[in-house]
C-alpha cells in the first residue's frame, strides 16, 4: 500500500577483498575461529552491557530533548525520506501516471529513530547533524541498486549527466540508459534539459541539497 515498505537496508561490503583473501578468511573461520555459541555469547553480553550502561546513565528512562534537536539535522531527515520515497516508487509499465509512491511519514519516523539511536550511543538526548550520516547511507542502500547507481553518478557529476556519459560510466546499452533516465523523470527525481540532440538530465531543485559539500562527504564515506 501507500504506507510503504517496513524494511530499510544497510549493505556491509568489502569490495577490495580479493578472492584469495576471502578464501583464507573463511578457512580461518572454520579452523581457528570461536564456535557459534561462543560468538553468540560474546555478542549477547556486549548488547546487555550496552543497555546496562544506558540504564545506569538514565535510571528513570530516557527523556528525549526535542527542543535541543538540531533543525538542520531534522531537515535532512525529512529530505532523505522524500528522496527515498522517489527512489522506491513503483512505475506502472503500462501507464506511468499510475506510479505508486509510498507515504513518507513512516520513512521520516524511521530515519528519526535511527538518528536518535546514534545520538544515544554518544550519550546525547538530542540529535545533531553528524547523526544523519547513517541515514544517508541507509537511504541509498534501501533504493533499487540501479537507481542508487544512477543517483550516485549524478552527484559525482554535479547533478547533471548526458546519455553518452552514463553509457560510458555504467557500461549499459544506450536504450537501457535512456530507459533509466525516463524512469528518473517519472519518479520526479530529474528533468530533461536541452543539449542539442543529446539526452541530458539534471537533478531537480528539491534534491539539490544532496550536492552540499558536507552531505557529499558523508555519502562518499560509504560509497
Which sequence ranges carry the predicted segments?
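Short acidic, hydrophobic short linear motifs in intrinsically disordered regions
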Residues: 157-170
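Short alpha-helical segments that sit at the start of domains
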Residues: 129-151, 157, 173
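Accessory beta->alpha helical hairpin/"wing" motif in late/C-terminal subdomains of nucleic-acid enzymes
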Residues: 130-134, 194-209
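Phosphate-sensing "switch" segment of ASCE/P-loop ATPases
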Residues: 1-135
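A short, conserved structural fragment
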Residues: 185-195
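Short, amphipathic alpha-helical interaction segments positioned at domain boundaries
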Residues: 140-143, 205-223
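Short helix-capping/hinge SLiMs at alpha-helix to coil transitions
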Residues: 121-122, 155-158
